């Protein structure tokens, strides 16, 4: 049997900080293994205003989830919200040199990475880029184009943008709590992962930067 795959989510909210540990099953579903929750006193409207209090709350929530799940938590996927978060819609295009060669993961990744280069307002940074659909030679509605043939790959992306200082403060809290950041993801999307395994796949494969 292969080693279990665990996904850890951390919600840094205004009223509470919660940590949840899920095990990814062979069928793609997630089974909850542990949960921890503490009061949040260092966060207001999705922004950290007291580093020390927030770090302490993160440590306590993670410790509870770790004890309940019997999992040594070293990294987390952080759900974020707040007035400083906004989302943009962008389309990427890649013209291929050889239409008879199968579309590769490298090409799809290039389309995605190009989204991190789009122009945004000063003081903001791109938190995450989520592919919504692919268009191959003007044929829309394609979810997974890997292995297909075509001259042109297009993709519609959901680009999540946040205030740089707010994002850095969250990352700082995670690091001071002795954890690594796997992903930062918009809370409604993180909530949808409970029902959509494809979002869970995104959380385990997509990196913050």
Where are these regions (language model features)?
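Nucleotide/phosphate-binding catalytic cleft detector across ATP-hydrolyzing
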Residues: 1-16, 20-208
């Amino acid at each position: 049997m292969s080693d279990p795959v665990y996904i850890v989510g951390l919600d840094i909210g205004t009223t509470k900080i919660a940590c949840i540990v899920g095990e990814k099953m062979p069928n793609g579903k997630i089974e909850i293994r542990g949960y921890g929750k503490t009061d949040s006193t260092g966060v207001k409207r999705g922004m950290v205003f007291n580093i020390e209090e927030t770090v302490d709350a993160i440590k306590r929530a993670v410790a509870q989830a770790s004890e309940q799940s019997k999992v040594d938590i070293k990294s987390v996927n952080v759900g974020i919200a707040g007035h400083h978060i906004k989302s943009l819609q962008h389309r990427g295009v890649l013209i291929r040199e050889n239409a008879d060669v199968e579309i590769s993961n490298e090409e799809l990744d290039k389309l995605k990475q190009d989204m991190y280069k789009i122009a945004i307002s000063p003081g903001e940074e791109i938190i995450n880029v989520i592919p919504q659909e692919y268009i191959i030679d003007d044929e829309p509605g394609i979810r997974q184009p890997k292995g297909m043939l075509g001259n042109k790959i297009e993709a519609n992306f959901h680009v999540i943008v946040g205030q740089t200082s707010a994002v850095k403060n969250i990352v700082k809290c995670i690091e001071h709590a002795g954890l690594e950041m796997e992903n930062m993801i918009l809370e409604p999307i993180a909530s949808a992962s409970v029902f959509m395994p494809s979002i869970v796949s995104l959380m385990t494969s997509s990196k913050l930067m």
